[in-house]
Amino acid sequence: MSISSRAISFGSPLLRRLVFVAVLLLCVTGSANDKNNKESSAEVKFSAHTELVMVPVVVTDKSGAHVNGLKKEDFTVLENGSERPIATFEEIASQPERLIRRPTPNMFTNDVTSSGRSTRRITLIVLDALNTPFLDQTYARNQLLKYLSQSLDRHEPTGLFLLDRRGIHVVHHFTSDPQVLIAALHKVMGEPLQGSDSPGDLALATGTTNPIGSQTGGVSGMAGSPAVPTTALMSAVSSEAAAFQTLVQDSALNFESFQQRVAITYTLDALQQVARAVGGVPGRKALIWAGGGFPFSVSDNTMGLAPAGRDTLSDVLPMYEHTWELLNEAQIALYPVDVKGVQPNMPNASDDLSTSPGTTGFNNYLRSTSYRQLDTQSTFESFAAATGGRAYFNSNDLVEGFRDAVQDSEQYYMIGYYLDRSNTKTGWRKLAVKVKRDHVQVRARSGFFVTNATVNPEINHDSDVATALKSPLDYTGMSLAAHWDDVVAGKEAGKKSVRFIVHVDPDPSLIDTTDDNHLVLEFVATATTPTGEKAGEPTGKKFDMHPKPDALATIKEKGISYRGALELAPGEYNVRIVVRDGLSGRIGSVAAPLKVD
């Protein structure tokens, strides 16, 4: 589900709340609950492919130093409490090697190479302006600049992204020189999420003022009108005032749920795009998420997505579970950093916040703010543990979190085992890694989702392709290159047919040898103007084939190419080319700027 950010920024604050009540109520339906219940009780329908689960494992001593020399026999992997045989094992000591794109005129590629062997270390940083108060955004940028200027290795592959209400943006690509990143950070300007309105609106929404009278409890009408001290009239006015106040509070809660749904969708979408951008690069990646908190809560035991106020979010669950799938496939460890710094003491159960008349709504607001802070910390910790990272909050020194994220990826173990296919129950599978060594600390992701949406790539086909086409990031699920070919007269007057060729590098994993060498590749290309408007019609083709021996040998040796064309009028365009593997769901994409004379 994708909702335009413009939908939450028009009109007066109170009008916005009231208008979107109806929209929100349409989003929250009983049928969504029914679908979710059916999905929870359904069995997983595995394909014929074996599922290799890769788990990066960080093992340190009490001082935090990496423990070297462990063997495969020293490790035990448990899935839902049952031991699984380790199929692959490797100890990795990574070096800060620059990732470099291969520059060639009129050649656009998503392939990245390193100076030596395949790079197994990337640090990614997301500044979350969508879910972060404006003042805290400035603090986060200053802390990040402090880390980059003092600690960053100039060879360390580092990517910086900004998330705001327009989506995810690339500030610095991980193939670029990290020195450029320091200069670029000075130019990053955060944009806060549409938040609290005027003090009067906040008071109205939280019940700190009487919406039709004074706060003194007197009854008044228009300015200058005397109070009418009749019991019946006072009772009627009080009743209407209470009803109206309830309506306003109800509308505010409904709008807050709607606004939260938008933030959840944008946040999950950003996580998916970042995971896709590094999914084709081997090794563990550290993702530092610097923000004021995720816009959702999760359960520690099931990692299920908790309701957002009155919104059950049932229809968002597939997107949430798919996000986990992509994070795990990309071997991303999440390091959430709460940029709000040290927080003041929060109210507890012993605090008396309910005795003063007229303060009920405000006290509820204080309580909800405090619990949101606790919720932020809990969700950050859950996400960090589930991915093998660490969470940092309630600190005025964020540099530690940035530094630890890089250090954890310097040395680690990569363990692989095959998924337990005898368990066909959908849901969260707990994962535990144990080491037969005393006085060591082991950190690995604590689980993963197994649902039909995660094992059947076709379920997310449409949303995956649509996101890839609009994303500013090149996806690296498969290595590809594209170039512009010749230009001929178009079928429509005033337009030209611009031909292009896309080449997918040889990749044995694209071919299913157990199904008569089955190969499924889908090519799609779209063009937009510099302002983001659609230009012309998308073009593409899907290949679903079982190549004969001669053709198969050529594909294995040289890869496979596709020739397409876009019908465009003269002008400048941003073209996005996407290639999707229909068997695994992997995606490769590349941007190819174009000027048509």
Predicted regions: what is each one?
Residues 1-15:
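N-terminal secretory signal peptides that target proteins for export/translocation
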Residues 17-28:
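Bacterial N-terminal signal peptides
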Residues 31-597:
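Scaffold/interface architecture of coatomer-like assemblies
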Residues 6, 25, 213-216:
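N-terminal start and proteolytic maturation junction detector
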